[in-house]
Amino acid sequence: MLINHLSKIRTVRHFSNIKPVLSKEVSRRVIVAPASHFKTSSPNVKSNIPIHEYKQLPEDSNYIEKHYKELQVFLNEFLIKKLNKTYADFEGDPDELVFQLEKFIELEVTPRYTNHSAPDGCEERFKSIGDRIVVDRYLDFVKDVRLTLLLNGGHSFIFDVMLQAKEVFDKMQKE
């Protein structure tokens, strides 16, 4: 009877949510590549950021103007150094610019300011409160870049223009 009972035992699959030791996960953010990255995407796929005629940013566009430092760092450390591009090179594909920015934050900014020896789910992953502020500022930066692109018709050249104008203004102030 015991043998009959044992023969009816089914194997059960067990799932585990333990991440592998060699995982590349830095944060719990999910980054989705634009449709242009997938071979199966059709050419008619609409962009998340609509592309239309250029519209000037409002006078109170402090949401992007407060990020001059981040604009410059992203341009110098990632776009020019790794991709050999400027902001204007993403004209016509604003989703790609946002994706590259999210990738930069996830793969370069976040690891630079986090402590990888801290246990998962621990709020003290950041080396200091200042490091957390830097990462949060970059996360705000990507939101503000997306908002700017939505408001101005998806034209990325504006970021190059803003940086050039600030450089000229700073030179004038020094004189």
UniProtKB/Swiss-Prot annotation:
Recorded superkingdom: Eukaryota
Residue range of the transit peptide in the UniProt record, numbered on this chain: 1-38
A Pfam short name: FMP23
GO cellular component: mitochondrion
Role played: May be involved in mitochondrial iron or copper homeostatis.
Miscellaneous field: Present with 2160 molecules/cell in log phase SD medium.
Identification of the protein by name: Protein FMP23, mitochondrial
Organism the protein comes from: Saccharomyces cerevisiae (strain ATCC 204508 / S288c) (Baker's yeast)
